[in-house]
Amino acid sequence: MARKKAALDFEQSLADLQTLVERLENGELSLEDSLTAFEQGIGLTRDCQAALAQAEQKVQILLERDGELAEQPFDAEQPE
């Protein structure tokens, strides 16, 4: 369940970030609102980057064999 929550949190953060970017690009926000949105966007970006880094670490751990890391490119088409 923790994995689903983490995935949902990442997806929600990414969706929120996309919404903020659209609002900023629209150009209808005041300077103060733009700065607030920008600050929120920075926080969401950091959250997303942290989630991606954590996912990358998990993938590397799963690929570990015989005490050595065997890095392999991710291939979504490759059967498990």
UniProtKB/Swiss-Prot annotation:
Per UniProt, the enzyme's principal EC class comes to hydrolase
Which UniProt keywords are given for this protein, alphabetically ordered? Answer: Cytoplasm, Exonuclease, Hydrolase, Nuclease
- Cellular component, GO, one term: cytosol
Q: Which Pfam families does UniProt cross-reference here? A: Exonuc_VII_S
Q: Which domain of life is it from?
A: Bacteria
Nucleotide-binding found in the keyword field: no
Q: Does the keyword Cytoplasm apply?
A: yes
**What reaction is this protein's catalytic activity?**
Exonucleolytic cleavage in either 5'- to 3'- or 3'- to 5'-direction to yield nucleoside 5'-phosphates
Q: Which E.C. number(s) belong to this protein?
A: 3.1.11.6
Quote the InterPro entries the UniProt record gives.
Exonuc_VII_S, Exonuc_VII_ssu_sf
A GO BP term, please?
DNA catabolic process
MF GO annotations: exodeoxyribonuclease VII activity
The places in or outside the cell where this protein is found are: Cytoplasm
State whether it acts alone or in a complex, and with which partners, per the record.
Heterooligomer composed of large and small subunits.
Q: Which NCBIfam families match?
A: PRK00977.1-4, xseB
Q: Which HAMAP family match?
A: Exonuc_7_S
Family of the protein in this entry: Belongs to the XseB family.
Q: What does this protein do?
A: Bidirectionally degrades single-stranded DNA into large acid-insoluble oligonucleotides, which are then degraded further into small acid-soluble oligonucleotides.
The name under which this protein is listed is: Exodeoxyribonuclease 7 small subunit
Gene from which this protein is expressed:
xseB
